[in-house]
């Protein structure tokens, strides 16, 4: 994936202006409401963003996003350790959609079409890297 300097700067805007844990936890809460079948893998979760199990999982998602952010030019090799997990890769896409909604809600007017496009590209790279390990 080729990143322009502008795209990287826009991804940095998202990364620097958000509370990662809160955004991801809220996105997970939204995921479980909008796509209830995704709770199949999280039977002990009550599905609310403030739930300790959701917060713990949000921390894992934040760690993966941080890893991708820190290696934005070459994400896939850094996601090898996710191979062998048995999760439907489509759930990653659904979570990415929920993250976009939550970021729009969090950043309001700052979530411009350009910023949205750059973040969407980033999340697609992450989803693709994660999905490779689950096939």
From Swiss-Prot:
Tissue: Red blood cells (at protein level).
Stretches that traverse the bilayer: none
Record keywords: Heme, Iron, Metal-binding, Oxygen transport, Transport
InterPro entries registered for this protein in UniProt: Globin, Globin-like_sf, Globin/Proto, Hemoglobin_oxygen_transport
Pfam families in the cross-refs: Globin
Note: This fish has three hemoglobins: Hb 1, Hb 2 and Hb 3. They all have a similar Bohr effect.
Function description: Involved in oxygen transport from gills to the various peripheral tissues.
Protein name, entry field: Hemoglobin subunit beta-2
Natural source organism: Somniosus microcephalus
Gene: HBB2
């Amino acid at each position: 994936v080729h990143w322009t300097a502008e795209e990287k700067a826009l991804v940095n805007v998202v990364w620097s202006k958000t509370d990662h844990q809160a955004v991801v936890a809220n996105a997970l809460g939204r995921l479980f409401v909008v796509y209830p079948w995704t709770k199949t893998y999280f039977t002990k979760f009550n599905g609310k963003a403030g739930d300790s199990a959701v917060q713990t999982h949000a921390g894992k998602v934040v760690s993966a996003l941080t890893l991708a952010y820190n290696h934005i030019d070459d994400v896939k090799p850094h996601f090898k350790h996710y191979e062998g997990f048995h999760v439907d890769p489509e759930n990653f896409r659904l979570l990415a959609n929920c993250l976009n909604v939550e970021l729009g809600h969090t950043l309001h007017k700052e979530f411009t079409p350009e910023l949205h496009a750059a973040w969407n590209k980033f999340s697609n790279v992450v989803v693709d890297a994660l999905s490779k390990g689950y096939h």
